[in-house]
Amino acid sequence: MRTNDLVSLYVSFVETNGGKSRPVLIRRVSEQTVEAFKITSQYEKKSAYIKQQYYPIQDWQSAGLKKPSWVDLGNIYRFPKAGLNFKEIGHLSKLDQNKISDFTLALKSSIVKSSATLRIYS
């Protein structure tokens, strides 16, 4: 498992028993932890606020995904590496690697601008 891999991880539910396998994009792998972003195919019914945090994977088919999908950049998830069970799906294309980097910078910039605006008026 390495950065920009797409894998399926079993994620436990927080409020009930059980869980399900979810596709994630690997951000970073260290000796002890794996950092990842969730991948979703659910986009249309999300709020504008949530949608602005979703990067649309351009080369989703070559990445091994079955349908158009988005990377949820709103939260990063950390998993202990020891005993982590995963299934390889594919790898993010160079095009998507570059575009997601630009998208992330633009997202951070808009968050900073929003925070600056809030500070001015508060």
Annotated model-derived regions:
Residues 17-21, 26-61:
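Compact nucleic-acid interaction/catalytic patches
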Residues 11, 38, 59, 74-75:
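Pocket-edge structural micro-motifs
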Residues 2, 29, 48-50, 64-72:
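A generic structural signal for short, non-catalytic loop/turn and secondary-structure boundary residues
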Residues 10, 44-47, 74-77:
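Membrane-targeting and insertion segments and their boundary/processing signals
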Residues 1-12:
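Short coil-to-beta transition motif at edge beta-strands of beta-rich domains
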Residues 15-20, 105-107:
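Short N-terminal helix-initiation segments at or just after the protein's N-terminus
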Residues 60-122:
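C-terminal terminal-subdomain/extension
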